Amino acid sequence: MQRSPLEKASVISKLFFSWTRPILRKGYRQRLELSDIYQIPSTDSADNLSEKLEREWDRELASKKNPKLINALRRCFFWKFMFYGILLYLGEVTKAVQPLLLGRIIASYDPDNKVERSIAIYLGIGLCLLFVVRTLLLHPAIFGLHHIGMQMRIAMFSLIYKKTLKLSSRVLDKISIGQLISLLSNNLNKFDEGLALAHFVWIVPLQVTLLMGLLWELLQASAFCGLAFLIIVAFYQAGLGRMMMKYRDKRGGKINERLVITSEMIENIQSVKAYCWEEAMEKMIENLRQTELKLTRKAAYVRYCNSSAFFFSGFFVVFLSVLPYALMKGIILRKIFTTISFCIVLRMAVTRQFPWAVQTWYDSLGAINKIQDFLQKQEYKTLEYNLTTTEVVMENATAYWEEGFGGLFEKAKQNNNNRKISNGDNSLFFSNFSLLGTPVLKDINFKIERGQLLAVAGSTGAGKTSLLMMIMGELEPSAGKIKHSGRISFCSQFSWIMPGTIKENIIFGVSYDEYRYRSVIKACQLEEDISKFTEKDNIVLGEGGITLSGGQRARISLARAVYKDADLYLLDSPFGYLDVLTEKEIFESCVCKLMANKTRILVTSKMEHLKKADKILILHEGSTYFYGTFSELQNLRPDFSSKLMGYDSFDQFSAERRNSILTETLRRFSLEGDGAVSWNETRKQSFKQTGEFGEKRKNSILNSMNSARKFSIVQKTTLQMNGIEANSEEPLERRLSLVPDSELGETILPRSNVINTGPTLQGRRRQSVLNLMTGSSGNQGQGIHRKAAASTRKMSLAPSTNFTEMDIYSRRLSQDSGLEISEEINEEDLKECFFDDVENIPAVTTWNTYLRYITIHKSLIFVLIWCLIIFLAEVAVSLVFLLLFEKSPRQDTGNVTKSSNNSSYGVIITNTSSYYIIYIYVGVADTLLALGLLRGLPLVHTLITASKILHHKMLHSVLQAPMSTLNTLKAGGILNRFSKDIAILDDLLPLTIFDFIQLILIVIGAVIVVSVLEPYIFLATVPVIIAFVMLRAYFLHTSQQLKQLESEGRSPIFTHLVTSLKGLWTLRAFGRQPYFETLFHKALNLHTANWFLYLSTLRWFQMRIEMIFVIFFIAVTFISILTTGDGEGRVGIILTLAMNIMNTLQWAVNSSIDVDSLMRSVSRVFKFIDMPTEEIKPSKPVKPSKEGPLSKVMIIENEHVKKDDIWPSGGQMTVKDLTAKYIESGNAILENISFSISPGQRVGLLGRTGSGKSTLLSAFLRLLNTEGEIQIDGVSWDSITLQQWRKAFGVIPQKVFIFSGTFRKNLDPYEQWNDQEIWKVADEVGLRSVIEQFPGKLDFVLVDGGYVLSHGHKQLMCLARSVLSKAKILLLDEPSAHLDPITYQIIRRTIKQAFADCTVILCEHRIEAMLECQRFLVIEENKVRQYDSIQKLLSEKSLFRQAISNSDRLKLFPHRNSSKHKSRSKIAALKEETEEEVQETRL
């Protein structure tokens, strides 16, 4: 960044903002980069401002029982705030003085008052000087207030962030992500530009008092008629505002329904294409859009009437003020024109400035109170440690995550009793709700010496993670004591990657030691992964390390924990995402060897780990089930240990399944020991539905950090179901639009209307910060740990408000170590962290965009022509009247003037009455122009219709775009087009265009009238208009680029907050809060640099506009004074209209800039509409299907299938030289893949994580850029359409897709099948019992990714879709990744039965599933290494041979059948596993 010219600028340069000229010149000539932006002044740095406010807030906290944040702000900013307020008041006072001078000028032209004619020129100079003074006062004052507002926002931003890092975990569990983002976005944004309006709350009453005093002198009591009318207009506008809010509230729900489906479609676009659901999704979204647009139109009409009210009130306020006085006493023109000028100022003050000021104070004080409450919340308390302690001791430790649960339990129980469930089962309730008031940990005791390994195991939700949190001090014990040195290192269960290099993530601010670093890299098996990157360990990782696989992220997190030199290492299930071989190697080399002399506590469920641990602690339901050595476990609990070791290959199971088995075993033995509750009662599954369909689930922050901790405390009830606290009065649409640009995009979306109160929702809590920290969003498809293939899409849900697509950090802050923080920003590194495409659209909206927008809807052209015709007609009529009255005979001046002055006439008569009538007509014409009912409503209506067409075209384009194009985009960027940009097209653009057209036509009309009255003025008008157009074009190039850079700079602030929250436990464990506060301040300073420069250039432009007009007004004043003879009416009309033109023309120019800015949304939409389509025309003609385009049967005109017209008939696949890429210009992910599959054969895909197994399945569906050929039953994929090709496959994807809709819609979106057929399939896959327990059965509405269903049930839904599709080839991509044994057996059985004659291609990590395959395709380094039977693979040295255990190997040879039978009997022992485990095993 460059040093700012402001530092060396002179007073004159600062006053006129001339120091911004270099950036304006550069922005006009070329595209601005971040390197062109000026550094911020030191007074605006986040460090200084936050320190200043923090000091005052601490003083406030120390001195008072009820501290007030506004007092701290007052002490920091009050005097500057008042100084600029006084300048603003003086500038506004000049507006009240100007009409007095205007009146004197008009009076000097009275034929009977020739004495004053000589001073008219001096009065004109005085009037012009007032304009100059006003310009010099108002602009610095407005800029100064904007600047103070910016400083207040920065200081409070920093204060909130620092407080967030200090909050206790209990508090974080009660705060939603939406609330935090709301504090930092909607609430604080009110200070930036709103502060300039705040002073009008006292300026307007003083101004109105002054104006009414001056009007009283002119019109006496009748002046109050005009004021009364303006007050009525203000109340009328307030009523319209309330009506508009009512429509917006209704519409907000409809918009959110549409955005839910749209976001689900975007996030799961690969599944939508795989299922061929493009038409169904398009129809579903368009239907919702239609309903939404009905309410949009109503709201737009109300807003139109509100906008028109301001325009037409101008004429009536003058009319009502003047008419009573004129009828009673008569009136002269001087009073009329003076009154008109006063009323213009009065109208703006009463109907605009004062309501805006009141709203600003209301919003600002509300925001300050919210921030004040937040800043007083309970903080995290650091435990007192003894640094000389070498042992870790816990004595009788008991802890609760949440307090006051007893009352909540009673209330929820009462609610349940009062609510009747439709199936009549009133006992359906939380089966584990009795645990609600129980501690998460109870009477825990253990002691480990230095260098020992304690293995912690236990059932799901037993409190394993909570135990580590209590040791770290995150969870405060309510009883007992903990003793250790306090030098802790921590590895979270869900890996957290901060933006930066791999090296920075591992070192994490600790001093760099080359030998230690290399040892850790080697022990964590990262050497091979790092060697694959061109920049090795200096590669910059973006958003959450999304370009890495889950295993790579897990190993980097582990390496970070191991690299730190600590006394105690807390490892929370660090191996969950590693394959069996890698896990074994890391455990041996890292945990057992490298850390041999360190004290370690490892959360694990592996028998191998338990055997090697010095001590074992097994937890169950928060209590100690066993503590001792492994040999003691075998002696004291022989039944338990033998049960676990009785499972074949227990350690080979996935971590989820091991936890499931462990949970079931512990519960079985604890129940047998206690004999308390019957097992069947415990496994009852249930749910309940809220009374109000719109009630939504609580989305608190602690959940986001730790939904995966799966506490035995259960889902909250309807008391806390919203994204904001239950008692929040914030409007619905406001809370639903505040979302971070992160992977946890669900806060943008409305929550479900269904609350599951049974075990199926165990572990799925609100979207809280605690959930965020453990990386579980709770919504399938939005989890953090994505596989390598999926991660390349870089898709995460983004905000709909104020978010552009930029990754968290504006730069890599340290090149070598996280210890040092550079002061200079490296722009190259900044570009690397830009995760989304920077908008590649021109700085100024092109004429082509305007032309496309106008022609998108034919009626729009006719409406614009109609507007022009009406305007020309109005101007023509006004000119005719003007010419007629110009030629009308004049009356005798003497008697009439005397009579007028003596007020003997009760009517409006003067010698220049013709001019007065002309002005009355001009006022009426302007009013008609402003009211514009004949053109305004059709214009607004047509522009909304254009928005409808654009949305339809964009939706169709996105659904038909190839994945290679979508892979280059970010889901947040796509969703922003459908949310933010469509909202602009619906709401802002129509009214802004209407205002712009209104203002331009008013200015043109006024200029024509003035020019006709005084032709010389037209000569002055032409250069002024040219100057305006040139100045606008000059400024627009730079301002739009600065605004874009400012928008891009805003996203890192919010993303940094979310990133910090995800890793909050890690930050605290490593003591890196100051480092991350510095990073946050850097992100704030980057945004401030852009915003401050934008504010400065905007003020430069506004000031130049006013200066040009002041010159124009000086010219008009002297032309009219010097060229007008005896005609006070002509001078009055010219000067009054000229003064009116000034404000209107400035407004019009600003509106034109707003239109250009909003049209960028249209440009972005057109960019999406112009995306390529993926449809590939078949090389051979295709005969249409007999049953229509949605038929389950494809009839292909092909020589291979003429005898049997049903295709595919057998499922034979031949793959020849298949090469696949994610994007056309990218590297090949798969190269020259060739093999063939016989009909009905089962083929397993083998290979390491990231080898391309999932990619191959995507290539079969033509979801990637592919070369080569695939044939199914002799039909080449080039000879048929994409839809026909994809319908040949049944798909069970790794990422389960359940969209918001009924069960029926989810199973059969095209409505091809009747209920009988759907129920038959539901029976086959074991879904009937699940569906029947919901009210409405097939018509029950699933929302929020089907969160009421377990992951296993969702997989069964996918299976049912495949059965209904009648596909002959089934593709399964790790279908059992998160399944419990019961659901897994159902899926295996169904596949065997329903797809007995089908070809099955399976990508799976479970050994027992792979054993059923006849052949295996081994993929290594993007190529096929082997394609053989499993027996042949085992006879050779291969990766598969190393991974498979001896017991599994036995199943493949002569005794295979009996072995299989034995295996089944063991799995059958789990038949009593409850649905709770099914839910708990999912991520």
UniProtKB/Swiss-Prot annotation:
Q: Where is the signal peptide?
A: none
Lipid attachment of type S-palmitoyl cysteine occurs at which residues? C524, C1398
Please list the residues that carry the modification Phosphoserine. S549, S660, S670, S686, S700, S712, S737, S768, S791, S796, S814, S1447, S1459
Q: Which residues lie on this side of the membrane: Cytoplasmic?
A: 1-77, 147-195, 244-298, 359-859, 942-992, 1037-1097, 1154-1483
> What residues form the membrane-spanning segments?
78-98, 123-146, 196-216, 223-243, 299-319, 340-358, 860-880, 921-941, 993-1013, 1016-1036, 1098-1118, 1133-1153
Which positions does UniProt annotate for ATP 1 binding? W401, S434, G458, S459, T460, G461, A462, G463, K464, T465, Q493
Q: Which reaction does it catalyse?
A: ATP + H2O + closed Cl(-) channel = ADP + phosphate + open Cl(-) channel; chloride(in) = chloride(out); hydrogencarbonate(in) = hydrogencarbonate(out); ATP + H2O = ADP + phosphate + H(+)
- ABC transmembrane type-1 domain: from which residue to which, for each copy? 81-365, 860-1157
PROSITE patterns cross-referenced by the UniProt entry: ABC_TM1F, ABC_TRANSPORTER_1, ABC_TRANSPORTER_2
Give the UniProt subcellular location, in the record's own words.
Answer: Apical cell membrane; Early endosome membrane; Cell membrane; Recycling endosome membrane
Ranges of Basic residues compositional bias?
Answer: 1455-1465
- The motif PDZ-binding: which residues? 1481-1483
Give the free-text PTM comment from the record: N-glycosylated.
Question: Where is the stretch described as Disordered?
Answer: 1455-1483
* Role, per record: Epithelial ion channel that plays an important role in the regulation of epithelial ion and water transport and fluid homeostasis. Mediates the transport of chloride ions across the cell membrane. The ion channel is also permeable to HCO(3)(-); selectivity depends on the extracellular chloride concentration. Exerts its function also by modulating the activity of other ion channels and transporters. Contributes to the regulation of the pH and the ion content of the epithelial fluid layer.
Tell me, how does this one assemble? Answer: Monomer; does not require oligomerization for channel activity. May form oligomers in the membrane. Interacts with SLC26A3, SLC26A6 and NHERF1. Interacts with SHANK2. Interacts with MYO6. Interacts (via C-terminus) with GOPC (via PDZ domain); this promotes CFTR internalization and thereby decreases channel activity. Interacts with SLC4A7 through NHERF1. Found in a complex with MYO5B and RAB11A. Interacts with ANO1. Interacts with SLC26A8. Interacts with AHCYL1; the interaction increases CFTR activity. Interacts with CSE1L.
What NCBIfam families does the database record attribute to this sequence? CFTR_protein (TIGR01271)
For this protein, the record's PANTHER family field holds: ATP-BINDING CASSETTE SUB-FAMILY C, CYSTIC FIBROSIS TRANSMEMBRANE CONDUCTANCE REGULATOR
Stated name of the protein? Cystic fibrosis transmembrane conductance regulator
Which organism is this protein's natural source? Atelerix albiventris (Middle-African hedgehog)
Question: What is the gene name?
Answer: CFTR
